[in-house]
């Protein structure tokens, strides 16, 4: 039976369809004859206890110069019978949180929201990994620049990053004796006012930062290793990393088994976990990526697996 699939995303005009996971989900929904609806960015609202948005019928095409057609926008209540894909990219700022609160009201009115709005509020992508300390490298999250500096000195090399970034932005590699360490910490913590994360530098990054996708807590059998290029230490695709598919190894599956059940319990139906060597470094719940690369390299249809789960009601 055709469903109404409503997508909350960043402007569709600016996406790169060859790598865009949201676009792959829309293609799969359309292939299944579901009705696609696009939420005008920034248009979610609440009126007398009901969530509304300016939405338009959407058609998509796998054509890099002409990939979508929109119908007329109209104010529509969100709720009963709708599948809402919440796919806005970070930062998870106040406006993002407000949108998830409005989506919680739509969920209470009968919509199926993916991922669960409460989980999107609760699970910071850097902090969430620390729910599973047995899987993580030595990590310190603090505003205290002195403590962060001592951590770097103890580990000898460390990665320093903000809690609200994505795509490799504002990530620093530092070491004991680095003359720039103080200014890096001042910048990341805003002079001791903002939390920052310090994590032991993992030499295995040269072999790739592995993105493992989970659907309802179960891992896809292949991951995408994002391999830094040249003198770069970041593997993120947005930072120029090269993506190479690999089958999951035994330890990858162990990490997924630690993380997956808790993600499923929280309604996080489509999740990306990042693994370097034997260590979990991040859990991505807002808008996990790398689906299209894995589909292309492994002959998969990951969006189809997600829609199979959605259509059964989860």
Curated annotation (Swiss-Prot):
Mg(2+) binds at residues 282, 284. One of its GO terms (cellular component) is cytoplasm. Pathway: Sulfur metabolism; glutathione biosynthesis; glutathione from L-cysteine and L-glutamate: step 2/2. Pfam families: GSH-S_ATP, GSH-S_N. The keyword Nucleotide-binding applies. Gene3D superfamilies: 3.40.50.20, ATP-grasp fold, A domain, ATP-grasp fold, B domain. It is an enzyme of class 6 (ligase). ATP binds at residues 151-208. NCBIfam families: glut_syn (TIGR01380), PRK05246.1 (NF003573). This is Glutathione synthetase. It comes from Xylella fastidiosa (strain 9a5c). The lineage of its organism: Bacteria, Pseudomonadati, Pseudomonadota, Gammaproteobacteria, Lysobacterales.
